[in-house]
């Protein structure tokens, strides 16, 4: 009937991807990314790294995979040597428990390269952009 159709078509739709964090609260991927890129602080960087890890490690949404570009963004961020130093010096104990390694200078670049490769695996169309990035950054 028309009523049934209207009720089912007006229901909540599921998101294709999980973007991490609290949706109606303050901490969302969008807010953290904006704050970090607008005025990066050690705290904003540490929070964003942990948000990326949550999104990549716990893919949700109807597709059950990280959103397009997230692995590439996160991987690139981990390949910046200063970010490993900042994380080691400023991350909270809880944030540091996100990763098994305490040697961030070695762990971050390895994981960064893996994430760039994962972006290509999940989204083959990204290879044209990501492959030269890997070649340039992961010598």
Spans of model-derived segments:
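Sec-dependent signal peptide recognition
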Residues: 1-3
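C-terminal motif of bacterial Sec signal peptides marking the signal peptidase cleavage site
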Residues: 6-9
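N-terminal alpha-helical interaction modules that lie
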Residues: 11-71, 78-107, 122, 138
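Boundary/linker segments of alpha-helical solenoid repeat arrays
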Residues: 63, 123-134
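Extracytoplasmic/secreted envelope proteins and their assembly/folding machinery
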Residues: 72-75, 113-116
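Short acidic/histidine-centered micro-motifs embedded in hydrophobic/aromatic stretches
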Residues: 73, 133-136
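Secondary-structure-rich domain cores
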Residues: 112-113, 124
